[in-house]
Amino acid sequence: MSPQTETKASVGFKAGVKDYKLTYYTPEYETKDTDILAAFRVTPQLGVPPEEAGAAVAAESSTGTWTTVWTDGLTSLDRYKGRCYHIEPVPGDPDQYICYVAYPLDLFEEGSVTNMFTSIVGNVFGFKALRALRLEDLRIPPAYSKTFQGPPHGIQVERDKLNKYGRPLLGCTIKPKLGLSAKNYGRACYECLRGGLDFTKDDENVNSQPFMRWRDRFVFCAEAIYKAQAETGEIKGHYLNATAGTCEEMIKRAVFARELGVPIVMHDYLTGGFTANTTLSHYCRDNGLLLHIHRAMHAVIDRQKNHGMHFRVLAKALRMSGGDHIHSGTVVGKLEGEREITLGFVDLLRDDFIEKDRSRGIFFTQDWVSMPGVIPVASGGIHVWHMPALTEIFGDDSVLQFGGGTLGHPWGNAPGAAANRVALEACVQARNEGRDLAREGNEIIKAACKWSAELAAACEIWKEIKFDGFKAMDTI
C-alpha cells in the first residue's frame, strides 16, 4: 500500500482519490478584479487538513472531480479552475476555517444567478470530506454584475412613481394570511390604505387557493387601491403576489396586474426560483411595475451558522436577479436579525459601494457600479412602540410593515393604520428636529398619543408585547 493510499484511507477516502491541494490550493495567487471571490466557513472531517478541505471546495465548485481524468488535457485547467488562495481559523472554534476561493469569470453564464449558484453552492455542499460548509459572502465584480439588469426600477424611481419622499414607507400584510374571501380581503386592504398606509400586501403563501382565486383577489384589491387613492389624494399600492406553479402562469398574473393599472406585484423569489424571478423582473421593468420580493424559505438556507448560505449572499443574488423591495428582518421584532449583521446586508442592498467590514459580516468590498438599489422591508412582530427604533435603524429608504400591528388594533383596521402613520410622522419630525430616537423614542410616542386617540389605543394594547430573551443564531 502506497503512502498516499494509507493517508487517504486514514481519513475516510478510498484509493485513487487525488490530493486536491496539489492543484487547487494556491496561496501565492493574486486575485484579479474580474474574479468572483467567495468566503466559505469550512468544517473539515477529523483528520482532513484545512488546506485539503479548502482546495476540495475550490475544486468541486469549479472544474475538479475526485480523480484525474484524461480530458483534463483537452482544456486549460489553469485558466478555468477555482483557487483556494487564503485560509484563516475561525476565532473560538478550532475545528472551523474561513477558506477564500477565487473563481475566474469564464466559469459563469452572463446574467444568470441560477448558473452561478449551481456551481458555487452545488454538489460541493454534500462532499463527504466536510462535516459542514457555509457560504458567508461573495464578491461580485463589476465585469459580472454589469451583465445583470438588477432591480426593475430602484429606490429613486419608486419614490418618483409614488411621489413620496423624506420618510420610510408604511405597509401591512393582510391577516389572516389564508382563508379570507376575495371581497373581504379587498375590504381589509381598503381600510388599511384609507387609514394612512402606503401599501398593503399579500402574504407569501397567498397564491390562488380554493377560498380565493388570484383573479378575484386582484380585482378587489385594485378596487380598494383606487377607492383609497380617491379619498386620500395619495398614491397607494398592494403587493399582488404573482408567484405561481409555472413561469407562464406567473407572467399571466403580472400581465393582468398591469392591465388593472396597479403599481406593484410580488414574488417569492426562493420558492419560485431565480430563473422565474429574473424573468418577472425583466417584465416589470419593461411594463412599469414595481416588484416586491418575499424571502420565504430563506431560514432553511441561512439560519444555521455552520452550514448553508448567509442571507447577505441571498441579498446580493436578489439585487442581481431583480427586485425593488425585499424582506430583511427587523432587528427588534419576532424574527431573527442581529443589528450590525442586518445593517451590513441592508447596505449591500441599498448602497452603490460598500467597504469590507468584518464587524458587520462583510468579507469583501462590493462595488455595484450603477445597479439600482433595493429597499429593505422590516416586517414581523412589530408595532407602534417599535417605530422610533425602526426609523433610527433603517432610515428613510425602507418599508416598515405592520401586519398584526395594524389589523390587531382594538378599534379596527383603519384606526390601526392611522396609529402607525401618526407614530411614523412623529418619529420623522422628531428626528428632523435633531432629537435622539434611540434615547427619546418612548417619550416621542407618548407625546404623539395626546393628539391621536388611535395611537393611544395602540400603545395601550401593545405596551407589554416584546420578543426578547431569545439567543440570536446569526452572529459574527
UniProtKB/Swiss-Prot annotation:
Q: How is the cofactor bound?
A: Binds 1 Mg(2+) ion per subunit.
Name the site position(s) for Transition state stabilizer. 334
- Entry keyword set: Acetylation, Calvin cycle, Carbon dioxide fixation, Chloroplast, Disulfide bond, Lyase, Magnesium, Metal-binding, Methylation, Monooxygenase, Oxidoreductase, Photorespiration, Photosynthesis, Plastid
> Which EC numbers does the record give?
4.1.1.39
Q: Which InterPro entries match?
A: RuBisCO (IPR033966), RuBisCo_large_chain_AS (IPR020878), RuBisCO_lsu_C (IPR000685), RuBisCO_lsu_C_sf (IPR036376), RuBisCO_lsu_fd_N (IPR017443), RuBisCO_lsu_N_sf (IPR036422), RuBisCO_lsuI (IPR020888)
Function, in words: RuBisCO catalyzes two reactions: the carboxylation of D-ribulose 1,5-bisphosphate, the primary event in carbon dioxide fixation, as well as the oxidative fragmentation of the pentose substrate in the photorespiration process. Both reactions occur simultaneously and in competition at the same active site.
The family assignment reads: Belongs to the RuBisCO large chain family. Type I subfamily.
What protein am I looking at?
Ribulose bisphosphate carboxylase large chain
> Which source organism does the UniProt entry give?
Zea mays
